[in-house]
Amino acid sequence: MNVKLRVLTVGVLFFTGQAVMAQKDSAKVQDIEEVVVVAFGKQKKEAITGSVTTVDEKVIANQQAPSVTGALQGTAVGVNIITTGGQPGNNPSIYIRGVGSINSSTQPLIILDGSPFNGNINNISQDQVESMTVLKDAGSTALYGSRASNGVIIITTKKGKLNARPQATMTSLIGVGMPAVELHETLGGADFMKYSWQSIKNAKVAEGVANPGQAATNTLINSLGYNPYNVANPIDANGNLVAGANLLWDTNWEDAILNKAAFKQEHRFNVSGGDAKTTYFLAADYLDLSGSVKSSNFERTGIRLNLESKVKDYLKVGMNSSFSSSSSNLPIQSGNTYGSSIQWIYSLPNIYPIFRRDANGALIKDGFGNNIYDYGANGAGTLNSQRPLFENENAVGALYNNYDIVKRSNFTVNGFAEIDLAKDLSFRTQLAYEQFMFDEKAYDNYAVGAAASVGGRVSQIRALGKTINFTNSLNYDKSFGDHNIGLQGVFEVYQYTYDYLQAQGTGFLPGNDVLNTSTVPESIGGYVNRERLVRYLGRATYNYKNKYFLEGTFSQDSSTKFSPDTRKGEFYGLGASWIVSRENFLADNSVINYLKFRGSYGELGNNKIIRDGAESYFPYQTLFSAGNNQLGQTGVILDAPANYDLTWEASISSTVGVDFGLFKNRITGNVDYFKRESKDLIYSRPTPGSVGNTTYLDNIGAIENYGWEINLSSKNFNNANFQWTTNFNLSTYENKLTELNQASFQNGTKRYEVGRSIFDFYIPEWAGVDAQTGMGSWFINDVDANGAVIGRKVTTNYTLANQADNKVYAGSSIPDFFGGLTNYFKVGPVDLNVLFNYSFGSYVFDSTYQSLMAGFARPGYQQSVDVMNAWQNPGDVTDVPMNIQTQNNNNATSTRFLFKNDYVRLKSLTLGYNINKDMLDAFGVNQFRIFVQGDNVWTWQSHKGIDPEQSISGTTDSRSYQSRTLSLGVTVGF
């Protein structure tokens, strides 16, 4: 789509090539012909009174994210995209204008070609998408009513063009990926042994042992279970390496687990065209992508067919259909479980080998000459005895002996008919059907690893989801001289069904991983979720002289998620705008070519209620679990008591904004201020113990988000030899609880308190290392005789510091501001697109680093190189407590592990060369483009060792790292 605009309007960001372009430089030309996809239709950009951002296919094509919504990162103002972890195919978290709930869903509604999409968004190929439109305020989203409080993303797929000959395009890419950032630096084998000895010696000193150095030497190997040296006691009583001691191995777990050359290939093909009445678009794609952890991958195949035809002068019909399937292997890449790949790197030091060793340190082979994985308990005849951690586990062995394969398929068909009933009256009916399958199968090896004791384990989940969405709309548009009105009425019925089945068994023979071959069926379970939604919608628009615009929308939604008494919800949106530059007093202004003021106000809803980490479809009803064995009889357990008064979460949204074009529209932009107040928040309320259950869902509180959005675009140079355009966007918002059913309560590292953000850290305050004892210290309140706080003082008692009154607020996990910077250059046949995204002001609690700074409190656990700076003698001034092998609170949760999380990332870079069309004509080719594409090319970050894109809660979880991907591609058009 080669969009050319005369002005920028309504906070809508349109890209030509990679930036906003002006069609004419004349300030007097101000009418805009381009239309924008909005709720249940399209509108001229000039007529939109709400806050909308559009990203087109060329911007999408310049990013390599498997999930098409990842292309919004850094390009869509007001949209915060967070991609956590390096598993390819994972969908990013999307936050539009803050976070409007504490327990319900905070993710936007996805609309695909006019209907809600419930499948996996990464099953949609970016090559099939024409544009994505983000609706951010009540004025633009109110027609989606109960599902729109978190914003709406409308994805529009490509179509053919009328009277266009067949146009075929093929794109192929081959690439390689590696971790985008460096991990925390950990100790090598020699240093680990040295400082382990030091920690044991310090413990012996504390115990009053007569010769602590010799005691540490005698204890070292027994405490670790393994000896990587060629001598029995490699460290002497003074902490030095004995003469002749050499390491037999020094395992680099990072190299063994992480994929430093992850292969990528992608192939896309489409053909489109049309005659005088019918258009078509046919596309197919294949993507094969390896992840940052070895054996992780994502493979996808898809096909799409879009057809439209004007079968009668008064009748137009169309159908959009697609099928996609994907497969992923998902080794555990987060969390602190024994099977987590990243946790393993940060837990197992280099002294523990990947493969078993004999008494001389040589590798032990099996009967086929293969190395044997070391599972931490080698037994007799081997050099080593037993690890003090993760016995019967080996992360590398798990990568290749176990698997967790997820297969998804998605089928959509969306048909419509448009009938012109009269000159200004039309009717549209649309029926969409979506079916998606989820199939996960996990296998833990029968012979080695955690499931060896039960003969292996197989877990399988199979789920089938179906969605039917039926809409009918009546549209009336009429002009009376300078007056223009539009009326729209819509009736929508939505039905969703999700059928889930899970089973697990143990005891498998070699080569068998089918559930019905298990010896012991461990568990079986299943459920069916259903939802129905009936909606009545209306929209009215009016403008006078295409200068003054008014819009009102209303929807009434009825959802089966709520009781009959609270089932109906009414939602609305109001918007107004004024194009000031069309007034006579600005008509000939040489500086201001376009100026528009706009505002909107309305109320939206949120019916995506979360219970126990999953969406709840029966939140108001009494829930039971049946099938529990009670003394051999079928039993029933109360899961949750009913609350028939439970109702919608509601969000009241208001926005004021200005759009402008300056200096013959060489500089264009928009500025928005928004406020979003969410009330009737749904959260778990405790029940009396006599009820026999802990919580039930209730409407208990309110929260608000407010902030600014700034978007600027400039056409720096535009001539035949050189083009350069720039786009910059910045967003900032604050988050605050305004109502709660209790004064406050702790939620992990946060405290929910009225007047504070739900993202404010509330933890003990680190005071440093006691120079005399080498142990940690913290600040607590200093109180007078009357109990009044008069200041802060230092204590070495962590229990006191961890009391609620002594903790402090210490930064927020949401950034002060975030956004992106895009520059597009074109010199002759060469073009370059560079996109940076950035985030400043947020804090992250690095629990991974916290575990690496335990100071050898537990034997055998890996440590950061920073423990080499630990306190050793009275009077030492350092910020690292002493290394001591005894339980202590030195690395307990506190501000010691809270860090600024600022970053700037070169998100995408595309350098292309287009061969001259005159050279291609002889070959029947009309396009030949060679390009190099990079994703996550470079990262600057204030806190090293983690990927800066962590969850919005600001806590690390030993997640895998995003990949830096470099690809070589070619596009050929016929």
Q: Where do the PLM segments sit?
A:
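Extracytoplasmic gating/loop element in the C-terminal half of outer-membrane beta-barrel translocons
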Residues: 240-244, 451, 559, 839-929, ...
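Glycine-rich, aromatic-lined ligand/substrate-binding cores of catalytic
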Residues: 812-845
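Conserved small-residue
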Residues: 169-245, 333, 698, 717-813
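Extracellular/periplasmic, surface-exposed regions of secreted and cell-surface proteins
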Residues: 28, 33-34, 60-63, 106-107, ...
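C-terminal extracellular loops and terminal segments
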Residues: 69-73, 697-704, 745-763, 810-821, ...
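Acidic, glycine-rich flexible loop segments
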Residues: 207-251, 264-266, 337-397, 403
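Short, small/polar-rich motifs associated with maturation and membrane association
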Residues: 1-304, 308-312, 316-318, 322-324, ...
